[in-house]
C-alpha cells in the first residue's frame, strides 16, 4: 500500500510538471506574438519619422510623447529593441540619426526605469549601451542615474550601468564611476572592470593618463583591476608599472600585476628588477619569483637563462614550472640544457622533459594538420 501511494504521488508530480510546461509554452508563445505585433506597430511609426529625417525635418514632438508613454513598459521596450535590431541591419545610418534626436525621451525613460524593480532597472542601461544612446553626449540626467545604479547591490544594475557609461567616451565619467564602485560595499570582480574598460569608446591614451594620475586614490583591489586593464590595452605605461613595482609599499597583488605588465611589454630598465625578484630568497614570498620567472621569457639573454636554470632547482613547484615554461618558450633545446637534463635533480629533469614533450606533441599535431 505504501509503495502504491508513492507511485501515485510520483505520477501526480509528473503530471503537474507536464501541465506547468504546457502552460508556460502557451504563455511564452502568446507573449512572442504580442512582441511581434508591437514591433510592427513601432516600425510603422518610426519609418514615418525616418521619412521626415530624409527630407531634412526633425522627429515630431508627438512621436516623442508616444515613445515616452509606451516604452515605460518593459514588454514594449523589448519589442522596440527587436524592431531596432532589424532597422539597424536595413538602414544603419537612418536608425542612428533617428535615435540621436531622442535625447529627451532617453532622459525620461532613464528616470522612469530607475524607479522600477532592480532587474527591470538594469534593462534600460543595457539598451543605452547596445545602441550607444549617449555616445559623445553624456546627458547629465542619464549619467547621474547610472551613478545611482552603481550604488545598488545588484550586480546586473552595476555592470549594465558601467557598460552604458563606457559608451560616453568621457574619461571623467569613467573615473567618477570607478570611485563610486571602489567606495561601495558590494563586490565587483576586477575582471569585469578590466574587460569593461577595454570597451571604452573614448581616447584610451587619455584614460590611461587619468588612471596614472589618480591611481593612489583607489583601493588595492581597484588598482589591480586598473593595472590589468593597462596591460591588456597598451604598452605605454612601462615606466609607471616599474615605479609601482619598485615601491615596496605597493600592495603585493598590484606588484604582481606590474610584473605581468612588464612581462607583456619588455622594458629595458625593468630587467634588473625582474632578475632580482626571480631569485626566491624568502619561501613566504615565492609568488614574486614564480611570476617573475614567467615575465623573464620576454627578456632573452645569458643572465636570464642562468637565472631560470637555477629556478628549476627551487623547492617550490610553481617556480620550477614557470621557469621551465619560459625556457621552453625561449626556444631552448635538450642540448642547450644538457647540464640540467643530465644532472642529479630528478624534479628539475622531469619538469623540463615534460615541457619538451608538450612542445614536440604540439609540433606533431601542427604538422599533421598541415598535411591533412
Name each model feature, range by range.
Residues 26-115:
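N-terminal topogenic membrane-targeting module
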Residues 64-68, 100-113, 136-149, 171-181, ...:
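Amphipathic alpha-helical scaffolding segments comprising HEAT/armadillo-like alpha-solenoid repeats
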Residues 116-117, 153-155, 184-187, 218-219, ...:
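Short inter-helical turns and helix N-cap capping residues of alpha-solenoid HEAT/ARM repeat scaffolds
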Residues 82, 86, 90-100, 122-134, ...:
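Structural detector for internal amphipathic alpha-helices that build alpha-solenoid repeat scaffolds
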Residues 154, 333-372:
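Eukaryotic acidic, Ser/Thr-rich intrinsically disordered low-complexity regions
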Amino acid at each position: 500500500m505504501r509503495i502504491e501511494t508513492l507511485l501515485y504521488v510520483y505520477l501526480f508530480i509528473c503530471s503537474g510538471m507536464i501541465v506547468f510546461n504546457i502552460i508556460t509554452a502557451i504563455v511564452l508563445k502568446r507573449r512572442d506574438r504580442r512582441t511581434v505585433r508591437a514591433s510592427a506597430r513601432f516600425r510603422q511609426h518610426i519609418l514615418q519619422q525616418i521619412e521626415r529625417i530624409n527630407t531634412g525635418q526633425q522627429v515630431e514632438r508627438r512621436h516623442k510623447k508616444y515613445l515616452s508613454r509606451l516604452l515605460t513598459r518593459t514588454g514594449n521596450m523589448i519589442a522596440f529593441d527587436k524592431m531596432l535590431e532589424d532597422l539597424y541591419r536595413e538602414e544603419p545610418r537612418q536608425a542612428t540619426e533617428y535615435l540621436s534626436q531622442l535625447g529627451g525621451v532617453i532622459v525620461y525613460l532613464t528616470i522612469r526605469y530607475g524607479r522600477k524593480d532592480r532587474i527591470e532597472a538594469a534593462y534600460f542601461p543595457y539598451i543605452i549601451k547596445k545602441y550607444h544612446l549617449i555616445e559623445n553626449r553624456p546627458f547629465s540626467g542619464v549619467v547621474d542615474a547610472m551613478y545611482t545604479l552603481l550604488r545598488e547591490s545588484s550586480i546586473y544594475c552595476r555592470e549594465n550601468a558601467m557598460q552604458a557609461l563606457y559608451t560616453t567616451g568621457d574619461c571623467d565619467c569613467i573615473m567618477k564611476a570607478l570611485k563610486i564602485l571602489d567606495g561601495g560595499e558590494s563586490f565587483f570582480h576586477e575582471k569585469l572592470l578590466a574587460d569593461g574598460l577595454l570597451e571604452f569608446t573614448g581616447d584610451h591614451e587619455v584614460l590611461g593618463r587619468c588612471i596614472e594620475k589618480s591611481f593612489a586614490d583607489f583601493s588595492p583591489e581597484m588598482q589591480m583591476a586598473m593595472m590589468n586593464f593597462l596591460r591588456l590595452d597598451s604598452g605605454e605605461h612601462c615606466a609607471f608599472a616599474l615605479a609601482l613595482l619598485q615601491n615596496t609599499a605597493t600592495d603585493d597583488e598590484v606588484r604582481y600585476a606590474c610584473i605581468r605588465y612588464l612581462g607583456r611589454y619588455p622594458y629595458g630598465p625593468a630587467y634588473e628588477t625582474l632578475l632580482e625578484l626571480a631569485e626566491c630568497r624568502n619561501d613566504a614570498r615565492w609568488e614574486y619569483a614564480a611570476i617573475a620567472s614567467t615575465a623573464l621569457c620576454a627578456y632573452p639573454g645569458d643572465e636570464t637563462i642562468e637565472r631560470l636554470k637555477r629556478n628549476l632547482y627551487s623547492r617550490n613547484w610553481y617556480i620550477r614550472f614557470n621557469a621551465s615554461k619560459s625556457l621552453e618558450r625561449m626556444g631552448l633545446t635538450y642540448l642547450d640544457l644538457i647540464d640540467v637534463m643530465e644532472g642529479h635533480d630528478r624534479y628539475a629533469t622531469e619538469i623540463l622533459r615534460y615541457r619538451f614533450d608538450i612542445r614536440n606533441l604540439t609540433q606533431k599535431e601542427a604538422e599533421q594538420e598541415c598535411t591533412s
